[in-house]
Amino acid sequence: CIDSLDTYSKRLYEKYLLRCIVGQTRDIEKRAIESNESVYDTIISAHTNLGELIALRPGEKFDIDKELIDAINSITNKETKLMKTGYGSVDKFSGGLTRGEITIIGGRPGHGKTTFLINLLSQMIHSGLKVVFFNRELPNSEMIKKLITLESGKLSYGMVRQGIYDDSEIDELKRVKSKIAELYNEEKFLMFDNIRDFARSSTEVSKFKPDVVMDDYIQLVQPSGHFDSRRLQIEQLVNDYKWLAKEHECAVVLASQLNRSVEYRD
């Protein structure tokens, strides 16, 4: 009953705010048509009136007691948001990937960003975690060839890419095919090479609800609007990914190409 009352009260208050908006817009329209004041004074007045409506929005609640209890319970129950990367040196200093946070892998072309992500992907899948991988640069077919090389340990990438095998290597290829089909099934792994923008990427994350999201690489994501500089575009994308990580309680790993200017710093 209390929940129903709270819901009804919230809806009633929202209806009141909508009526206020209608009233304010009528006043703004009337003032714009009939007033002899300058257009800038009219704009300032409209901005002020709408700002007053924004102030009527109920504030967000923060319960320190609840947050403290949740934190203590998490500690005592040894619950953790960390996921091991499989890289000992990384796990030693960071503990691994963290749910609700992003990790950015930066490097110049050819420095192994994609290779690092593929190894990280393998570690996550072998740990039983769900992963979404966005390929902005390579087609899925090439990524699969890299996975075959990684999961085999016997077949080289050049061999797989060129299709040069003998009978024993064909047997190994069949074995790896079965292994990958079992491990990287559609319930645990999705990979896209045809999604250009963040909005569609976010939609796929919302539907799949992964533990880890990987994006290789973010400079190739199509911007959602106009930006005065590439830097502002990347900042907005990183912010969008930060909120996505928090909303879905997943870890996000982004590969990013470093600006050449870093090579000339003192």
Protein language model features and the residues they cover:
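The Walker A/P-loop phosphate-binding site
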Residues: 59-154
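Walker B beta-strand of ABC/ABC-like P-loop ATPase nucleotide-binding domains
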Residues: 214
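Flexible beta-alpha connector loops of hexameric P-loop NTPases
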Residues: 161-165, 223-235, 265-266
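Substrate-engagement module of ASCE P-loop NTPases
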Residues: 233-255
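Residues immediately C-terminal
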Residues: 220, 260
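Cytosolic-facing regulatory segments adjacent to core modules
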Residues: 92, 126-209, 223
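Short, small/acidic-rich helices and loops at N termini and domain boundaries
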Residues: 1-75, 111
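Walker B catalytic acidic pair
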Residues: 217
